[in-house]
Curated annotation (Swiss-Prot):
This is Peroxisomal acyl-coenzyme A oxidase 1. Homodimer. Interacts with LONP2. Gene3D superfamilies: Acyl-CoA dehydrogenase/oxidase, N-terminal domain, Butyryl-CoA Dehydrogenase, subunit A, domain 2, Butyryl-CoA Dehydrogenase, subunit A, domain 3. The modification N6-succinyllysine is found at residues 89, 159, 241, 349, 437, 446, 512, 542, 637, 643, 655. GO terms for biological process: fatty acid beta-oxidation using acyl-CoA oxidase; fatty acid oxidation; generation of precursor metabolites and energy; lipid homeostasis; lipid metabolic process; prostaglandin metabolic process; very long-chain fatty acid metabolic process. It comes from Cavia porcellus. It catalyses: a 2,3-saturated acyl-CoA + O2 = a (2E)-enoyl-CoA + H2O2; hexadecanoyl-CoA + O2 = (2E)-hexadecenoyl-CoA + H2O2; dodecanoyl-CoA + O2 = (2E)-dodecenoyl-CoA + H2O2; octanoyl-CoA + O2 = (2E)-octenoyl-CoA + H2O2. Its main location: other. Its cofactor is FAD. It comes from the Eukaryota. The modification Phosphoserine is found at residues 26, 649. Pathway: Lipid metabolism; peroxisomal fatty acid beta-oxidation.
Amino acid sequence: MNPDLRRERAAATFNPELITHLLDGSPEKTRRRREIENKILSDPDFQHENHNFLTRSERYEAAIKKSAVMVKKMREFGIADPDEIMWFKRLLLGNFVEPVGLNYSMFIPTLLNQGTTAQQEKWLHPSTGLQIIGTYAQTEMGHGTHLRGLETTATYDPKTQEFIINSPTVTSIKWWPGGLGKTSNHAIVLAQLITQGKCYGLHAFIVPIREIGTHKPLPGITVGDIGPKFGYEEMDNGYLKMDNYRIPRENMLMKYAQVKPDGTYVKPVSNKLTYGTMVFVRSFLVGAAAQSLSKACTIAIRYSAVRHQSEIKPGEPEPQVLDFQTQQYKLFPILATAYAFQFVGSYMKDTYHRINESIGQGDLSELPELHALTAGLKAFTTWTANAGIEECRLACGGHGYSHCSGIPNIYVTFTPACTFEGENTVMMLQTARFLMKVYDQVQSGKLVHGLVSYLNDLPSQRIQPQQVAVWPTVVDINNPDSLTEIYKLRAARLIDIAAKSLQGEMSHRKSKEVAWNLTSVGLVRATDAHCHYVVVKLFADKLLKIQDKTIQAVLRNLFLLYSLYGISQKAGDFLQGNIMTGSQITQVNQRVLELLAVIRPNAVALVDAFDYKDITLGSVLGRYDGNVYENLFEWAKKSPLNKTEVHESYHKYLKPLQSKL
């Protein structure tokens, strides 16, 4: 054990194990997670080769092999609970992805959400056992987030009771679905449904794309891999072109919308029900943002405690990099954000399951807010985490650029989350549309509920910019309730401004669509403020539920740092709205610096509480034992370029050149 890390852990004011239990949900869940992890670590069937030194084809093959072993072992270990599957995969995959992943994260959930009982009986068992390997083919070359623009068609033929699937243009080719290139034999295809001469919009169809047994593409199907990408080297993101490809009527997922044998269309209760899979994935992306950010943070903070550099006073020993205030200012707000997103991720998961149960019983009342909340928080958390991961890499100095740090792999694996499952700016605008509807409801005298209920205060003059006197003159910057309140005021003010800008443009005889585009920057700002408020509120709510006073105090400091750092970064909003004064902002900035010093003794223990195994981090710099330099040298020796003392290119090109000089 590195002596610096040993000292850091001994100096902590709390037991990290207690926070680990909090993050997992209970001591029993922590015990079970570790039991699963230990089974994997002690199993010789799991060969943990270093993906960094493999070619793309080798990485894909290694990932397929790992997936096959994983399915077999999950059966053997009796792992079926969703949380346990997540723990299993988190350890096994580390910072990489699996080609069969969409079978479990998209294909099966869509089948469960949108398939009839008969359809589930037919396809669910084969897909859980990987006889059917499914993917989710929505995005096309020409359209992604704009679903109404998708061009793939499914035209019903009542004579044969079949749908004819077509990719009518080059831009209609399905493009990007994971596992499509080489792995999947079925896809849930989103296509424009045409029956009795009328288009009824997007619907989901189960489309066989490869022959079971030979795995060859079926006639009428053109399918392949789209080539190298920024990351995701193990994943065969693919393309799919369908030419007059026929599937049985029963292959349309018909839990909500239906097409009768004669071609009659039966519409669903709500069109939003068909977006269930996207809402499901977006709700879980918040947790994924927390996980990726907390991994990067763990690596950067541990390495900053091990690394000694420069001098604070001439002639004195080089201090730990973590002792520099600038390093703390880079990393501790990210640490606080990682914790905030952990709690929001848990809330989103629980909320999704609760509302999904209500939907199953026919109650759709909370669906609009769930749709808006998942869209906005997906964008807010993934953007923030993406920037935070890169900040962690930079905080590791030059070594952060090496794959040995683990952070480049975390970054390139996470960064697509900013554009998949809905491009983030478009997601913010979807939430803004909901906020504008709620704003109009409040203006017409209706009471609204849920996380937007603070907008009920809008009609009172309390949040109008000109009514300065009614704003709180004292903001207690050490009080979670007070901080939550000022984030609420900021959100309400920016929503009010955005709504009035929109109304102003429309009053100039512009159509709502043109007015929307002309005010969209303000609408995104309003959504960002709403999401920021939601995160602050949910973090504050979590503090109240923590029984252990020591743990509550430690996490309260992180809450204060998260909230106050956010105010310092968005000071203009709080000043312009007369929510805070200039002197209060100065106090906030000073308090942020004080909190860095308060959190410093607990920094390593706080990342230890995430309880990541070294294999999950995939980092030489972030090792639990802190023995960085010895392992850095050993890692470099494994580079394939070091297999020979003299590379063959020397004899081919350099030596002949040198001999002629």
